Amino acid sequence: MTNIRKSHPLAKIINESFIDLPAPSNISAWWNFGSLLGVCLILQILTGLFLAMHYTADTMTAFSSVTHICRDVNYGWIIRYMHANGASMFFICLFMHVGRGMYYGSYTFSETWNIGILLLFTVMATAFMGYVLPWGQMSFWGATVITNLLSAIPYIGTNLVEWIWGGFSVDKATLTRFFAFHFILPFIISALAAVHLLFLHETGSNNPSGVVSDSDKIPFHPYYTIKDILGLLLLILTLMLLVLFSPDLLGDPDNYTPANPLNTPPHIKPEWYFLFAYAILRSIPNKLGGVLALILSILILAIIPLLHTSKQRSMMFRPLSQCLFWFLVADLLTLTWIGGQPVEHPFITIGQLASIFYFSILLILMPIFGTIENRLLKW
């Protein structure tokens, strides 16, 4: 008699995805972030659902409802801070996951990679809209500044911005629609994640060496289920340390002041995970140019597979490309720092240089270094 997990239509899908899935025997801890992203998504949906039960999407009561959740709702404070810091953990895992894909050449699975880029954009949109909901000063002004960027689009820009706002400024209509979108998008993300996995399981996972591993596969369970549980425990530990000891570490103090359209904060900035893109946006004096650079800073990931010149897939045995990769990581950290600084000397110059380096590494230096390494190996 066949085991029920191999015959039952639903159990079969789970079995082929998480139990009997053939996985390379040498994938490292860098392959843990996919499952951690799944856990983050589930955590965000659950905590978000409980927050939505008490939140009111109205400009008059939104700020008070968040205060009410923290003060009066049973364990409301922990749900709120798990949701806010859970977003930070989500982005840490996302950046690690994308970085792993770039380092080990996983982008050669083009369908999986492109769905991943779509997922990244969707998660960023969701996080941005979520940041607007508490209706603090930074929520309001962040929404005003970022949505206003669309006015740089020639001819239709102004109409587009007013259409998104639902009026002539960020107001009740904007908050209501942002709440509606923030609620629905995580479910769209879940569907996209399922498609992402579907395409991944068509080809099988990549591995650190970048070599086809069909001759050396092991079952996902118990080897990688146990390994993923270790990653999960470390994720929960980090999240709970943040939530219970310094919940406001990654937030902005300005967001504890209710939104006031008559008073602009001295320095408007988004959450930390958008600062690198914000720094690239600010480094270009022209509005339309800045918006294009902002979009391209993420969209550039889509052309990375086309710029792969090396005859090796992974960077594991390519020391020159490794140096360049870590230089890129340092550059992104510099951009993140600059994004949080005021627009004054010397930060403007540092931001402009870091932005030039960012695009130069990805568009020019990476392909050149790949070719040099081929020549060094006489390929």
Swiss-Prot record:
Binding positions for heme b b566 per the UniProt entry: H97, H196
Cofactor(s) named in the record: heme b
One biological process term in Gene Ontology: mitochondrial electron transport, ubiquinol to cytochrome c
Cellular component annotations (GO), alphabetically ordered: mitochondrial inner membrane; respiratory chain complex III
Residues reported to bind heme b b562: H83, H182
Annotated residues for binding of a ubiquinone: H201
GO function terms (MF aspect): metal ion binding; ubiquinol-cytochrome-c reductase activity
Gene3D superfamilies: Cytochrome Bc1 Complex, Chain C
Keywords associated with the record: Electron transport, Heme, Iron, Membrane, Metal-binding, Mitochondrion, Mitochondrion inner membrane, Respiratory chain, Transmembrane, Transmembrane helix, Transport, Ubiquinone
Subcellular location: Mitochondrion inner membrane
Oligomer status and interactors: The cytochrome bc1 complex contains 11 subunits: 3 respiratory subunits (MT-CYB, CYC1 and UQCRFS1), 2 core proteins (UQCRC1 and UQCRC2) and 6 low-molecular weight proteins (UQCRH/QCR6, UQCRB/QCR7, UQCRQ/QCR8, UQCR10/QCR9, UQCR11/QCR10 and a cleavage product of UQCRFS1). This cytochrome bc1 complex then forms a dimer.
Extra facts: Heme 1 (or BL or b562) is low-potential and absorbs at about 562 nm, and heme 2 (or BH or b566) is high-potential and absorbs at about 566 nm.
Record's protein name: Cytochrome b
Organism listed in the record: Viverra zibetha
